[in-house]
Curated annotation (Swiss-Prot):
Protein name (record): N-terminal acetyltransferase complex ARD1 subunit homolog
Alphabetized Pfam families for the sequence: Acetyltransf_1
Species per Swiss-Prot/TrEMBL record: Leishmania donovani
Lineage: Eukaryota, Discoba, Euglenozoa, Kinetoplastea, Metakinetoplastina
Alphabetical keyword list: Acyltransferase, Transferase
InterPro entries the record matches: Acyl_CoA_acyltransferase, GNAT_dom, NatB_acetyltransferase_subunit
EC number(s) given by UniProt: 2.3.1.-
Molecular-function GO terms, alphabetical: protein-N-terminal amino-acid acetyltransferase activity
Broad class of enzyme this protein falls into: transferase
Superkingdom of source: Eukaryota
Length: 186
């Protein structure tokens, strides 16, 4: 059993256990604060119902303009102890639903390391497609870090109902990789 609820800024002081994975992107307090205050409906937590221990969370936002208005997943992370029980999938479904029903977005997008096959498999199960590759999107940690060199990201997208209204679908893959400076939303 799990309790799903809106994230608060105080939660950021308690979810280090969720962020232990080297594949989880972590941010500074002001970044989390910006998300919690500007897009509170997108910030979701899973906590253990009896211990209140953070189990998983998502960070998201609405961005873009016109036909590029979309939901964006900045982070989804599940604590190692609580993996393989669909917490990430449930949070991702909530984020897509929020993007569609509250924000009337055209699609949801996210970036994932090319080497993170487990996450890619989950996103594919949820209906996401690889829209494009962003070359050297993730910066390496150097010789002593877990990621020695820069790594490409896959920009994955999930079309929402409103995508049918676009002149060109948001999920037709690009035929070439791009550089980070070519991204529309920075």
């Amino acid at each position: 059993m799990t309790t799903y609820r809106r994230m608060t800024l105080c939660d950021t002081l308690q979810f280090n256990f969720v962020n232990l994975d080297q594949l989880t992107e972590t941010y500074n307090t002001s970044f989390y604060g910006e998300y919690v205050t500007h897009w509170p409906e997108y910030q979701r937590m899973c906590v253990h119902p009896t211990t209140n221990i953070p189990m998983a969370y998502t960070l998201g936002k609405a961005e873009g303009q016109g036909e590029d208005y979309h939901g964006h997943v900045s982070a989804v992370s599940v604590a190692p102890t609580f993996r393989r029980v669909a917490l990430g999938e449930t949070l991702m479904a909530e984020l897509a639903q929020m993007s569609e029903l509250v924000h009337n977005a055209y699609f949801v997008d996210l970036f994932v390391r090319k080497s993170n096959q487990v996450a890619q498999d989950m996103y594919h199960r949820l209906g996401y497609i690889v829209y494009r590759t962003v070359l050297n999107y993730y910066h390496g940690d150097g010789p002593k870090g877990p990621f020695k060199s820069d790594e490409d990201a896959l920009d994955m997208r999930l079309a929402l109902r409103r995508d049918k209204e676009r002149r060109k679908s948001s999920v037709i893959p690009l035929d070439r990789p791009i550089k980070p400076e070519e991204l529309e939303w920075v």
